[in-house]
Amino acid sequence: GILSWSFFAKTLTRGTTSLQRNSGLIQRIYFPREIYIFSQTGFQLVQLLLSMIVIIPLLYHYGLAPTIQILYFPLAVLLIAMFASGLAFFTSIIQTKVRDMEHIVTVALRIGFYLSPVFYNLDMITGGRIPVEYTDLYLYANPMATYLTMMRCAFTGQPLGIDEFNLAVTISSTVLIYLLGSMYFTRKERKAVKNL
């Protein structure tokens, strides 16, 4: 849970400040500015994969052999990367105009950390703490809850416990956020460069 959340949080925070931190280079040389967001995502992905190397011996030590559920891992990593990058497309543009956006993102991530199943299973929330009629709303409003659960299930071999409809809505919303963020970034990047 913590490694997945860290991947998401660092991708989003560093993506938010990527244009501002590279303003000198951006103003001198033109190349696609999305590269700055993607480079942060790629760097954090490498860090996540290197951190996972430590997890593998621990899994064997505790008798957790890989199952077919391990296929959730690449899907969850891809979706977390898309979600973080999509949000970073929005926040990086806003950061060029509103310099406190980085701090707003940091506070939002701290709140999201406690609202997401980082240190606990999703069952602990959905099994009584949240009324059944609000469980779907919780999963729709917090895609990271689904993705953290997918990562956990990938390594523990437990069933996902999220129905296909909720999973489809969460994945669709992530793809939509990514596409809208990308379009917003493309439309506003020239104006953002002037704000640097």
Indicate residue ranges for each PLM-predicted region.
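Transmembrane alpha-helical segments that form the membrane-embedded catalytic/substrate-channel core
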Residues: L3-G15, A81-I94, Y114-D123, L179-Y184
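Short alpha-helical transmembrane interface motifs in multi-pass membrane proteins
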Residues: S4-A9, F38-S39, I68-A76, Y134-L137
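Transmembrane helix boundary and interhelical loop/hinge segments in multi-pass membrane proteins
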Residues: F7-R33, F38-L45
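Hydrophobic alpha-helical transmembrane segments
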Residues: R14-I29, L49-L58, L109-T126
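Hydrophobic alpha-helical segments of integral membrane proteins
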Residues: N22, F38-G42, M101-I104, A108, ...
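Alpha-helical transmembrane segments and their short interhelical loops
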Residues: R33, S39-A108, G161-M183
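Short cytosolic juxtamembrane segments of multi-pass membrane proteins
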Residues: D100, T186-L196
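Short hydrophobic, aromatic-rich alpha-helical segments embedded in or entering the lipid bilayer
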Residues: Y114-P159, D163-A168
